[in-house]
Amino acid sequence: QLEGRYRDGMLSNLITVAKDEAFNEEYEQFDIIDKEWTEWFSNGEKRVEVTYKSGGDSKVGKGSGTWNLWFENGNEKLSQSYVDGRADGTWREWFENGTEKKEYNWSSGKLDGKYVEWYESGQEKIEGEYSNGLKEGAWTEYYATGEKKSVESYEGGIPSGEWALFYANSNSKQEANWDQGVLSGSWTEWYADGQKRIEGEIEDGLAIGVWTEWYADGTKSFEGTRKRSVKKEKWTIWNEKIQRSINTL
């Protein structure tokens, strides 16, 4: 197995572990030279292939190169690249059966561009975009069967816009809205069969106005008015045929 360590976003050292022995390449030492090596499994299949080129610069973590790992069955496991000691370019990971697991891009040590994950079956699991190390735009997650599980929206890594959750049968589960990282706007939840469960409004992260909740059979369970806090609430409970007022300090 090959392990790497980072310090301040830069490649610091490599550790290759083979059975009970460990070989440690400390790049923080000032005797860095170009290195290339390959390891094999006992069955003859390639296990690790690493290139490291210092480019004549002996400063900490300034080298460039690639890491490539394989499973014992010969299928690729991991492919990574570095420029000046920082993650750079397209990185890829695979399942042992040969199906791609992840693919994402780096630019000068920061995630940048498209990010995708798959299930072992090959079905897409997650897709989204990074910009300068932060999530940007729409991010979508899928169930193993292919139906959407969630949709999220970001601006500069901060939740923004509409977020939605779905049941495996494709029916909506929850919808909410974000404004620069703060919940604001309508909030709605549904049962798996499509029956509405909860509905209300949020402003600056606080529930306001009329909130209504229903039982699974569609019968209204209660309704209440909120004024940005829990100090004053007035609830009407239909199922129990009781009306009550709640005032808390």
Residue ranges and their predicted role:
Residues 1-249:
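Glycine/tyrosine- and acidic-biased, solvent-exposed loop/turn segments at the edges of beta-strands
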